[in-house]
Amino acid sequence: MSDPNLNDAVEPEAGASESAKDELDIVEAADSVDPDQAEAADLAAGEPAERAAVNVAGDDSDEDDAAAEEAVEADDESADEEEAEPAAPVDPVAALRDELRTLPGEWYVIHTYAGYEKRVKANLEQRAVSLNVEEFIYQAEVPEEEIVQIKNGERKNVRQNKLPGYVLVRMDLTNESWGVVRNTPGVTGFVGNAYDPYPLTLDEIVKMLAPEAEEKAAREAAEAEGKPAPARKVEVQVLDFEVGDSVTVTDGPFATLQATINEINADSKKVKGLVEIFGRETPVELSFDQIQKN
């Protein structure tokens, strides 16, 4: 029985065979050239060919050098343009907004006892770690501002809370995280609905945190240029009261009564004191504009 592969073998096409034969003839013809004739031909054509090759190479080299010089000049011009156009300053408020937009959680406001804001912030951060709710409670902030206080003729720069009695908390609100925040010492509750508080909007939180961001950006820019920090408009407070002072209440339900100051809170601009009512001393909280020093 014959092999089908052998029977099905295809005869090579005539064109392909002739092409291969032509290529073989060329190779054989090259091999059959007389060495003396080849050498003579090389000598006859060698010098002009080498000269032409040198000229071509020289022309190519000149063109390459010219192109390289043009590229360098273009780079120099581009560099000059970049130096001539300083980078546009970054708007710190816009940068803050972009950063806040990408952060996890929502911002809530909690109410604290006056003067306990920083203590509440520290306690809350510690409790978030110890009670394993770091994945829900991310950040606590007490916005501050710099003011000038004048007391007994002495001028002093101090930082005080911008929102006395309040702390900002960035968190995911769950039953567990709500309980940790609400039961932090010094916290009296969430602002708004006590059990289902509403978060601040992006515009609201930006407005609260923007002044500090602007101050920081201005300070860093001045330091980078080796200049002093720019002067800022600050509030001036004149403190005429001291613990132990006897004052007269000028406004409110205790007007005309005498009080003795036992605590002063410059941040909230309030004092705590004792007012004698029906022969008994009663603790009260009064604002600076409700009392007058005797």
Curated annotation (Swiss-Prot):
Pfam families assigned to the protein according to its UniProt record, in alphabetical order = NusG
Q: Which PROSITE patterns match?
A: NUSG
An annotated GO cellular component of this protein is: cytosol
Q: Which residue ranges have biased composition labelled Acidic residues? A: 25-39, 59-85
- Biased composition, class Low complexity, residue ranges: 40-53
UniProt record, GO biological process: DNA-templated transcription termination; regulation of DNA-templated transcription elongation; transcription antitermination; transcription elongation-coupled chromatin remodeling
Q: Where is this region: Disordered?
A: 1-91
- Where on the tree of life does the source sit, at the highest rank? Bacteria
Q: Which UniProt keywords apply?
A: Transcription, Transcription antitermination, Transcription regulation, Transcription termination
Q: What InterPro entries does this protein map onto?
A: KOW, NGN, NGN-like_dom, NGN_dom_sf, NusG-like, Rib_uL2_dom2, Transcrpt_antiterm_NusG, Transcrpt_antiterm_NusG_bac_CS
Protein family per UniProt: Belongs to the NusG family.
Function summary: Participates in transcription elongation, termination and antitermination.
Q: Which PANTHER family match?
A: RHO-INTERACTING TRANSCRIPTION TERMINATION FACTOR NUSG (PTHR30265), TRANSCRIPTION TERMINATION_ANTITERMINATION PROTEIN NUSG (PTHR30265:SF2)
Q: What protein name applies here?
A: Transcription termination/antitermination protein NusG
Q: What is the lineage of its organism?
A: Bacteria, Bacillati, Actinomycetota, Actinomycetes, Kitasatosporales
